[in-house]
Amino acid sequence: MADYKDSLNLPDTAFPMRGDLPKREPQWVAQWQEKKLYQRIREICAGRPRFTLHDGPPYANGDIHIGHAVNKVLKDIIVRSKTLSGFDAPYVPGWDCHGLPIEHQIEKLHGKAIPADKVRELSRAYAAEQVERQKKDFIRLGVLGDWGNPYLTMNFSAEAGEIRALGKILEQGYLYQGLKPVNWCLDCGSALAEAEVEYEDKNSPAIDVAFEVHENHTAKLAAAFGLTHLRGPAFAVIWTTTPWTLPANEAVSVHPDLTYDLIETEKGALILVRELAEAALKRYGLEGTVAGSCTGDKLDQMLLKHPFQNRDVAIICGTHVTTEAGTGLVHTAPAHGVDDYNIGKKYGLPVNNPVGNDGKFISTTPALSVGELAGKTVWEANPQVLQELEARARLLKNERIQHSYPHCWRHKTPIIFRATTQWFIGMENKKNEDASTLRWIAERAVDETQFFPAWGRARLEGMMKTRPDWCVSRQRNWGVPIPFFLHKETGQPHPRTAELIEQVALRVEKSGIEAWFSLDAAELLGAEADQYVKMKDTLDVWFDSGTTHWHVMRGSHAADHTYPADLYLEGSDQHRGWFQSSLLSGCAIDGRAPYKGLLTHGFVVDGKGHKMSKSKGNVIAPQQVSDKMGADILRLWTASTDYSGELTISDEILKRVVEGYRRIRNTLRFLLANVSDFDAATDMLPIDQWLEIDRYALALTRELQDGCRADFDKYEFHRVVQALQTFCSEDLGGFYLDILKDRLYTTAPKSVARRSAQSALWHITQAFVRLLAPITAFTAEEVWQVLTGKADDSVMFQVWHDLPALAGEGDLLAKWALIRTARADVTKALEAQREAGKIGSALQAAVEIHCGGEKYEALASLGDDLKFVFICSSTVAVRDDNEQVIATPLEHAKCERCWHVREDVGANTEHPTLCGRCVSNLYGEGEVRGCA
């Protein structure tokens, strides 16, 4: 008996079924570096419209974590998709290199006693080492970029650029020096920016303290409450969770419009806001009678006695007072709170700060009767202050509460508000009297920015409305200096500061920040040097990264950027970090945001929605995923997850991603295997010669490509992945490719029927591999090499595939949608026959499908080809308004070659095991297919 297996056009490809990604991907990385893929893409894209995604620099300290990986992969997806969209989309990665975490690492390694210049030298070397470690991991993820020439905020050009940016902001009138309360970390020994503060729960004392009304003001107080006199002493009661700030108290604030009651109790008359009075009395275990009431404005300027210092303080009015908790009267220490400072400024209160840089009370702090405060930390002072209040009978209640409290983001320790002389970028400052405030300019810039997702707008708007002035000075060594010479008597910057800044910048450009720290003032000031002191403060690291639009985009890497950038992309925490610092510096320098759009992604959590931490043992490191499963799996997971919320990852989730990847890979393998003997230059058929189902597949591919391109442009990558996976499983694997196998394998190799199928498959593969390229970068490159056979080529040298035009595409899609509905009905009927044991496969059945209307017309138009669509040996459409599918077993012989069960099997005596169409395909003119 003849063996006809060799007569089939069986699929053949060098593209392996198993991806073996952990092994193959590093080889691709090496190949890309060897052939300078990124540089070649730049050459090919030269002259195209520019798209600028400006990289927010990760901090150069420690290995990258899964959040870093998500961030870089999202950026790479955008850069790749924009390149395929016909843009020139360079990507210059950057690193944030100055700041306290690195300085702390140096102190850990070398001790705290090392001199400042040595700290800077060691910090620079440490940061460079960290950059190389992180760079290697980012490259392993398949991220394309100018890795040989990244921007580093510690590059001399960047350091000089930051100094020039500061000069510009000073020039515009937004920079000022002031004694104000700022976030202060006792462990850092430095001021913190808003972005360096995070809120955690803290257990604190919550105390109610009585401030006695001064005897000279009791009559005035009685009158305010509509009384002729007071029966005894009266007290204004405050509530606070920071007893240590009471030595710095300068006033008690009330709300001018709220109603306050004077309540007579056994401990004297207490002034409490009406809304909180009942709860307060209950807290004190007291009963009382309301003697009188008045609004807060009637109490303005009443004198009180400080609870333990021999001085008087006044009641003042402020709209910051609320009825959320406490007593409705607020202890006011201008040195230890922003609201306190602002209201104190209005009333001309002194800014009395008794706390030093180390968080300890200074030597001149007045002693308490129970002991000295001087030399004690603020936390040590708390119990002592409570003891003093108790001794003076001024403590009405002392309890512990759990509440949200600001912590240093590095040390995870509670911070304090502490007034120090710092440099600020003023939100209410103006360039000149006729100009708008920086806050107004920033709010307008937010309004002009596009947000992905849209909710980011409200978040940044809210922050701009309420944020305080930006404290940009730090008391550290490893940072860009604030290069001002301050007059020894007035404290004012030198009148030639703008000119001096440029001279310093030129020196820093050559030698780095050490040029300032080692500078002799006389070199720039001459004889004036004796009258000035050189500042030692450094700039907030958020100023470093926040001004990259100036010193990178329009400085060191201007050729690779356009200003403003099209997009900034970072995690949701950067609304209060890089997005905000960039916005403020951009508005201060240029009067606009340095970006047109902001994209925000959520944080990565484990499968149960918990934050990842080493202590919980739920950390998934990107390096482990790449080494075990492959970077393309991590990239596919990133793209398939809706980043607008939290991104959930677990071993189980990654397993599902692997399964999805395998389906895609198997589809790609089928496509490649069936075009391996197809040369588009010589074998491509004109579209009017294609079979109808092939034209339909092309229409589906165009729908896919148009939809994916739109989703790429909207940065909705999870929708792209959904569409690609649906196309693979339903349109291709579950329909088109299943139907196509018979035609591909059994018709003559060069027949119109087979070439039509291959023409469609070639276009599908060309489009599909490009749509995958931004996401599964390594796999797409592997497919491209097999598809083109050109080792020196790359899918990233291309643009989206130009699919051939197709007339009547809408009608075709509608018609085949009906056919697919009918096919689903047929499949159910065949499954019932299979379950009943009447057939083994669909090819052993004959099908009658009864239907009417458009469905019948669609099915009948396929004629004898209908059986190929249903993968049956015999199918007929019957016009009948009573829809039904009748499937019956066939009794004929099965063709050994095509497996169809046909009456004409054996009709040709020379080939007794073949059906008529196989004989024709092998030895005759070949069967004619019209539709499928």
UniProtKB/Swiss-Prot annotation:
Q: Which domain of life is it from?
A: Bacteria
Keyword Metal-binding attributed? yes
Q: Which terms in the Gene Ontology molecular function aspect does this entry carry?
A: aminoacyl-tRNA deacylase activity; ATP binding; isoleucine-tRNA ligase activity; tRNA binding; zinc ion binding
Q: Does the keyword Endoplasmic reticulum apply?
A: no
Q: Which residues bind Zn(2+)?
A: C895, C898, C915, C918
Give me the comment on cofactor binding.
Binds 1 zinc ion per subunit.
Give start-end ranges for motif 'HIGH' region: 58-68
Q: Which residues bind ATP?
A: K614
Task: Tell me one GO biological process term.
Answer: isoleucyl-tRNA aminoacylation
Span(s) of short sequence motif 'KMSKS' region: 611-615
User: What does the entry list as the binding residues for L-isoleucyl-5'-AMP?
Assistant: E570
Could you tell me the keywords of this UniProt record? Aminoacyl-tRNA synthetase, ATP-binding, Cytoplasm, Ligase, Metal-binding, Nucleotide-binding, Protein biosynthesis, Zinc
Q: Name one GO cellular component term.
A: cytosol
Give the SUPFAM superfamilies listed for this entry: Anticodon-binding domain of a subclass of class I aminoacyl-tRNA synthetases, Nucleotidylyl transferase, ValRS/IleRS/LeuRS editing domain
Subcellular localization is given as: Cytoplasm
Which catalysed reactions does the entry list for this protein?
A: tRNA(Ile) + L-isoleucine + ATP = L-isoleucyl-tRNA(Ile) + AMP + diphosphate
For this protein, what is the EC number?
Answer: 6.1.1.5
- UniProt xrefs under PROSITE patterns: AA_TRNA_LIGASE_I
Q: What is known of its domains?
A: IleRS has two distinct active sites: one for aminoacylation and one for editing. The misactivated valine is translocated from the active site to the editing site, which sterically excludes the correctly activated isoleucine. The single editing site contains two valyl binding pockets, one specific for each substrate (Val-AMP or Val-tRNA(Ile)).
User: What does the function comment of this entry state?
Assistant: Catalyzes the attachment of isoleucine to tRNA(Ile). As IleRS can inadvertently accommodate and process structurally similar amino acids such as valine, to avoid such errors it has two additional distinct tRNA(Ile)-dependent editing activities. One activity is designated as 'pretransfer' editing and involves the hydrolysis of activated Val-AMP. The other activity is designated 'posttransfer' editing and involves deacylation of mischarged Val-tRNA(Ile).
Question: What family is this protein classified in?
Answer: Belongs to the class-I aminoacyl-tRNA synthetase family. IleS type 1 subfamily.
User: Subunit structure, briefly?
Assistant: Monomer.
Under which name does UniProt file this protein?
Answer: Isoleucine--tRNA ligase
